[in-house]
Amino acid sequence: MRLAAAANEAYTAPLAVSGLLGCKQCGGGRDQDEELGIRIPRPLGQGPSRFIPEKEILQVGSEDAQMHALFADSFAALGRLDNITLVMVFHPQYLESFLKTQHYLLQMDGPLPLHYRHYIGIMAAARHQCSYLVNLHVNDFLHVGGDPKWLNGLENAPQKLQNLGELNKVLAHRPWLITKEHIEGLLKAEEHSWSLAELVHAVVLLTHYHSLASFTFGCGISPEIHCDGGHTFRPPSVSNYCICDITNGNHSVDEMPVNSAENVSVSDSFFEVEALMEKMRQLQECRDEEEASQEEMASRFEIEKRESMFVFSSDDEEVTPARAVSRHFEDTSYGYKDFSRHGMHVPTFRVQDYCWEDHGYSLVNRLYPDVGQLIDEKFHIAYNLTYNTMAMHKDVDTSMLRRAIWNYIHCMFGIRYDDYDYGEINQLLDRSFKVYIKTVVCTPEKVTKRMYDSFWRQFKHSEKVHVNLLLIEARMQAELLYALRAITRYMT
């Protein structure tokens, strides 16, 4: 589905790079501009991702006709082809749904004015210190007529947006603490109050950008050329590199090794894949032979929830937010805390009592028409997406593994499925993978390339991007469940 936006209305300023990085092939005037004394920015880094070799991304984008259409749609709608889009190129079915949903949230008719939408995106991304997304939406905020003074800090924004800060904070880091009192405080704030429709729009935006921050860090997305950290004015050290090389597959810089398993023998990582395949086969046989009781499955959930508290990285250090990002939110010390740490007990969220399909979907669609359907489609695509491959193996049913990943994320948020045996999680997800999952979902600003490289070492980069799509959609659904349940309780 083509995005409904005229190309001649596109915002082209941020990514008009072909002129800046001109060459004989694309018609630009690099040499001429330099002779005139114009400082010409050149991209830092080696492509859209710091974790994935550029040539793998560009190869996929150049071979798939569907991708060309999606790229044209994205550029027409946003005036740019950002690095997130380029990394999602591995999974065109998901990318199409993602772009369609994001376009609707930001640009189509809805309860919130356009500049509010981008400012909320800034607030949400800033909670995870995601300067990449903050920079993108600062530009968009100004383009749609936002007041530059608001960008000096949240205290300079309208009180109505300042009031949203508490919900943003809790939703990003400890969504299980959200109550109907949070909702009531926003809906009954006298002249600064939110309508229910506005609040649902805001909640969807917050959860969308919290999750997108996870994808940004989880895939090592590089800064855009027009943003801080994305360019240099120094002469190129290897050869003149032009943006037009993206379209013809030329590369002028050395690529990272294709295999992400650094310092690990091929045989070791091969046996890891074989062991995982064998565990999946054994679990399927156990499923067919006997089924655990409800009491046993409830006990296994509690065990897994407790164990998830002790999954952390050896690199787990506090990251101090830069002032350029931290000014967009309050209480910078507030962050993720494990579900049941310090003896605090929060009741388990049972999906059988409140779920997206039966409750959240209809509430969103009622207050913000069509968005529920778009989000639901995106959830289903991410959850069911499969190419029936695992590393070098083909014709593999990966549904068991995908469900374990999804349910592990929800388990970390205290969300339980009565019909799932949580004993499968420890069988299928090893410690390095759990560390990566928890970091991407809970504290994405702490993700490192070492974490990315250390899990599923024999798997393709496209499969790791697929994992990140599962992580961000499971996270978004978990946040939505807590927020929408609180709204439902307020309404009843």
Swiss-Prot record:
Tissue: Widely expressed.
Catalysed reactions, semicolon-separated: a hydroperoxide + L-cysteinyl-[protein] = S-hydroxy-L-cysteinyl-[protein] + an alcohol
Modification sites for Phosphoserine: S293, S314
Major localisation: nucleus
Top enzyme class: oxidoreductase
Ranges where the record places region C-terminal domain: 321-492
Origin: domain of life: Eukaryota
Pfam family, one: PA26
Localization: Nucleus; Cytoplasm
Active site as annotated: C130 (cysteine sulfenic acid (-soh) intermediate)
GO cellular component, one term: fibrillar center
SUPFAM superfamilies per UniProt: AhpD-like (SSF69118)
Positions bound to L-leucine: T386, Y387, N388, T389, T398, E463
EC number: 1.11.1.-
Record key words, sorted: Cytoplasm, Nucleus, Oxidoreductase, Phosphoprotein
Induction entry: Isoform T2 and isoform T3 are induced by genotoxic stress (UV, gamma-irradiation and cytotoxic drugs) in a p53/TP53-dependent manner. Isoform T1 is not induced by p53/TP53.
Region (N-terminal domain): 71-252
InterPro entries in the cross-refs: AhpD-like (IPR029032), Sestrin (IPR006730)
One annotated GO biological process: regulation of phosphatidylinositol 3-kinase/protein kinase B signal transduction
Function: Functions as an intracellular leucine sensor that negatively regulates the TORC1 signaling pathway through the GATOR complex. In absence of leucine, binds the GATOR subcomplex GATOR2 and prevents TORC1 signaling. Binding of leucine to SESN2 disrupts its interaction with GATOR2 thereby activating the TORC1 signaling pathway. This stress-inducible metabolic regulator may also play a role in protection against oxidative and genotoxic stresses.
Family of the protein in this entry: Belongs to the sestrin family.
Domain remark text: The N-terminal domain may have an alkylhydroperoxide reductase activity.
Subunit structure: Interacts with the GATOR2 complex which is composed of MIOS, SEC13, SEH1L, WDR24 and WDR59; the interaction is negatively regulated by leucine. Interacts with RRAGA, RRAGB, RRAGC and RRAGD; may function as a guanine nucleotide dissociation inhibitor for RRAGs and regulate them. Interacts with KEAP1, RBX1 and SQSTM1; in the SQSTM1-dependent autophagic degradation of KEAP1. May interact with PRDX1.
Name of the protein described by the UniProt record: Sestrin-1
